[in-house]
Amino acid sequence: MVGKILIDTNVLLDYLLEREPFFEDAKKVISSCTEGNTKGCIAAHSISNMFFILRKDYTAKERREILSNLCTIFDVEGIDKAKLLSGLANEEFSDFEDCLQMECAKSYGAEYIVTRNVSDYSVSNIKAILPSEYLGL
């Protein structure tokens, strides 16, 4: 496996919501981090996004517990003023949130962004790969 990865929100949601056919690969990616094979990171803004998205499936108390657990498993890379300004200046990204994910991955020193939306990162400085590609490394 590789040294450091940033796990995109969609992969985390695949795991938390057991979305098929993506759940098994997402589970294996997360397991590689919990077992110490890889250092995994999530962007801090992914937590707030997931708190909102998960509201249909979990109570507020359950969401707090689930997301707190993720924060103990993974390193969390925050968004500061410099990352925001860098992201805002980057006109190549069509999706600002993806640009912020890339900024977090870059700051963390990630080798890869593990995502199901590889095409969203076509202009990223950090290579984006599918969970299945990551598992094959």
Regions found by a protein language model. Give the residues of each.
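Acidic, PIN/NYN-like endoribonuclease modules and their adjacent C-terminal/linker elements
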Residues: 2-4, 106-137
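Short acidic, glycine/proline-enriched helix-loop-strand junctions
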Residues: 61-84, 121-137
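Short, conserved alpha-helical segments within structured domains
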Residues: 42-46, 83
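A general alpha-helix detector
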Residues: 11-12, 49-50, 86
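Short, well-structured N-terminal submotif of metal-dependent ribonuclease cores
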Residues: 1-41, 55-62, 123, 136-137
